[in-house]
Amino acid sequence: MSRRKRPNWINTIALERMQILFEQAEKEFSKHPERSDRYVKLTRNISTKYNIPLPNYWRGRFCKNCNKFLKPGSNLRVRLSNNTISRKCLECGDLKKVPYTKKN
């Protein structure tokens, strides 16, 4: 017997909450970085509970290793080399490499 599917309005509310939490994390990062880290953790909890994937533009804004909110220049180092984007978290040292191609 399969599990019952959640109504669509629940997923809509969960996405709205996740968006609000990420916006708050961006606003609070300069004054209270620990608060923005908590918002990221809450967003990931909502995402896993309701089985909603995070949109691509949010996936690069936090470290998957230490759950910290990442802002380039303050706790994230971004390097471009050999068709890869290297993103290094300066909190835990985790390195993520993403391939890219140049557009003409």
Curated annotation (Swiss-Prot):
It is found in: Cytoplasm. Coiled coil: none annotated. GO terms for molecular function: ribonuclease P activity; zinc ion binding. InterPro entries: RNP4 (IPR016432), Rpr2/Snm1/Rpp21 (IPR007175). It catalyses: Endonucleolytic cleavage of RNA, removing 5'-extranucleotides from tRNA precursor. Its EC number is 3.1.26.5. GO terms for biological process: tRNA 5'-leader removal. Keywords: Cytoplasm, Endonuclease, Hydrolase, Metal-binding, Nuclease, tRNA processing, Zinc. Its cofactor is Zn(2+). Pfam families: Rpr2 (PF04032). Consists of a catalytic RNA component and at least 4-5 protein subunits. Zn(2+) binds at residues 63, 66, 89, 92. One of its GO terms (cellular component) is ribonuclease P complex. Binds 1 zinc ion per subunit. Belongs to the eukaryotic/archaeal RNase P protein component 4 family. Transmembrane segments: none annotated. This is Ribonuclease P protein component 4. Part of ribonuclease P, a protein complex that generates mature tRNA molecules by cleaving their 5'-ends.
